[in-house]
């Protein structure tokens, strides 16, 4: 299937790959992508972005993001910012393009219910996994209607997903669900 949107960008969608209740479609293109921006993952790997709590107390729905790059920084809705350098793992509420050499307060939601403290290890990264589609849809609807997400609903949806995947997490972390099922995802990708 080929799609040509208003950005005049073409890509192919692969045939679905499925294992049990997981289906993956790959997007492929031969076109050179616009390179006047960095993704959050790329910026992290090049040490061009800083992500911190907004102050020492923190705020559940905001993170302070500093783009130290000479390029814009593209932060995608549903990306998970994970690690113990922040008080809890967060998921990005909406796609944001952060200007070069600037700092913004990024709207996020908590995706790790039972932790509110940083740790000594001071690790921080971007998850390989995005917030699941049902959760994204629900959050987007809440943002559209109320200009904010319903944090309790997000935690309930993550809890439901844990039950569905038969996974457990001491901190109620969305990332733990994906880590427990990573072998399944890797097997689908390799097939």
Regions found by a protein language model. Give the residues of each.
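Intrinsically disordered, low-complexity Pro/Gly/Ser/Thr-rich segments with frequent PxxP/GP/PP motifs
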Residues: 2-29, 80, 84-128
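Short acidic, gly/pro-rich beta-turn/loop elements at beta-sheet edges
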Residues: 34, 75, 116-118
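Generic alpha-helix detector with strongest preference for long hydrophobic helices that associate
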Residues: 5, 46, 89, 139, ...
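Asparagine-centered strand-capping/turn motif at beta-strand->loop junctions
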Residues: 63-73
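Short, solvent-exposed loop/turn segments enriched in Ser/Thr/Gly
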Residues: 55-63
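Elongated alpha-helical scaffolds
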Residues: 72-76, 106
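Mixed-charge (acidic/basic) macromolecular-recognition segments
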Residues: 111-191
């Amino acid at each position: 299937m080929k799609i040509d949107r208003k950005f005049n960008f073409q890509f192919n969608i692969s045939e679905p790959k499925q294992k049990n209740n997981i289906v993956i479609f790959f997007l492929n293109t031969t076109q050179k992508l616009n390179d006047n921006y960095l993704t959050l993952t790329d910026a992290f790997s090049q040490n061009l972005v800083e992500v911190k709590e907004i102050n020492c107390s923190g705020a559940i729905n905001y993170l302070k993001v500093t783009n130290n790059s000479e390029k814009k920084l593209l932060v995608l809705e549903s990306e998970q910012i994970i690690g113990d350098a922040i008080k809890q793992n967060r998921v990005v509420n909406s796609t944001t393009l952060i200007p070069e050499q600037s700092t913004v307060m990024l709207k996020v939601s908590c995706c790790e219910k039972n932790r509110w403290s940083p740790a000594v290890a001071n690790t921080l990264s971007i998850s390989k996994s995005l917030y699941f589609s049902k959760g994204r849809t629900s959050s987007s609807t809440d943002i559209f209607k109320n200009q904010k997400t319903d944090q309790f609903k997000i935690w309930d949806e993550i809890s439901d997903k844990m039950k569905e995947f038969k996974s457990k997490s001491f901190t109620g972390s969305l990332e733990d669900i994906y880590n427990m099922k990573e072998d399944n995802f890797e097997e689908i990708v390799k097939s």
